[in-house]
Amino acid sequence: MIDEKDKSYLEEKVKQASNILPQKIVEDLKNLISNKEVLVTRDEIDKIFDLAIKEYSEGLIAPGEAIGIVAAQSVGEPGTQMTLRTFHFAGIRELNVTLGLPRLIEIVDAKKVPSTPMMTIYLTDEYKHDKEKALEVARKLEYTKIENVVSSTSIDIASMSIILQLDNEMLKDKGVTVDDVKKAINRLKLGEFVIDESEGNTLNISFANIDSIAALFKLRDKILNTKIKGIKGIKRAIVQKKGDEYIILTDGSNLSGVLSVKGVDIAKVETNNIREIEEVFGIEAAREIIIREISKVLAEQGLDVDMRHILLVADVMTRTGVVRQIGRHGVTGEKNSVLARAAFEVTVKHLLDAAARGDVEEFKGVVENIIIGHPIKLGTGMVELTMRPILR
């Protein structure tokens, strides 16, 4: 905190620092000084801002630094030390999660669907402290088809009917009743049919106008693949205790579908599917998740990479307003230089296409100048000097 008489002095320092420091840092410093429990004097305000400016200035790159190459090296080199395995998730046998190098490759390749899509779903206050209520939400999320609750099926050729033997344990586990199964079948357009229920949860589905066994088998497959409840893409939903609350971990991801389920805290839903984040929340959120996912992958492997390198990778991937991969179909493939594109991948194709189009190489970048042995415009090469032999 500060004296009332020093408030105007703090505002003046904030105004001066705004010309040097980023706005976010200035605001954080102001809040820190204003909300500190002990009294902060004018001298201390000066020291805080001077130290912040000094640290910030030392953290800036030198003009002409090849930041792209440094970032590529700083993220890529630790990647060679990563493991190549898919791990079980936090002691849960049913869920696998891709970590290490395969996950890093997925992120920078901007894959539409990760190899192990998953979500971490937080619940609202009404649901997060009650396990039964959390299980209720999990059952709403888990995509359940009729085949998931059937122990066996058979076909009675004499009566042209399909017999489904329902599994009592699976019905209980999935939170599904026999009536739910009947309703799902009745929603199908199968022509004229009657469902008879017998003891032991056995359903006998008789058809009036079916005279072919092949047609009966097709109908059976259609019935087994019929949705009873849940959200498409969510194969499993498992309730886990985290601290003093229950959360739901899912095998599979469907962000837009999950947000519409009652009991889900929409402000805290997480998914490892970057494309879904982009579609639902936009490019800024996608950039944030790229940063978070790369940082998480590196941290899990015990690798320490400066955050600025990761930020640069995320910025390059999202700078056009859509998520692009770092590869020949994305960032690298869109370079203006013919030689730079050819140096990366499929060399002959790039050269032939460029020749057919009549492209001109302007030698403005780094790669193309190195290829032909020209000095590059980086570091001291950025400075152009003209010598005057006689100076009067």
Swiss-Prot record:
GO terms for biological process: DNA-templated transcription. Pfam families: RNA_pol_Rpb1_5. GO terms for molecular function: DNA binding; DNA-directed RNA polymerase activity. It comes from the Archaea. It is found in: Cytoplasm. GO terms for cellular component: cytoplasm; DNA-directed RNA polymerase complex. Keywords: Cytoplasm, DNA-binding, DNA-directed RNA polymerase, Nucleotidyltransferase, Transcription, Transferase. Part of the 13-subunit RNA polymerase complex. DNA-dependent RNA polymerase (RNAP) catalyzes the transcription of DNA into RNA using the four ribonucleoside triphosphates as substrates. Forms part of the jaw domain. Belongs to the RNA polymerase beta' chain family. This is DNA-directed RNA polymerase subunit Rpo1C. It comes from Saccharolobus shibatae (strain ATCC 51178 / DSM 5389 / JCM 8931 / NBRC 15437 / B12). The lineage of its organism: Archaea, Thermoproteota, Thermoprotei, Sulfolobales, Sulfolobaceae. The gene is rpo1C.
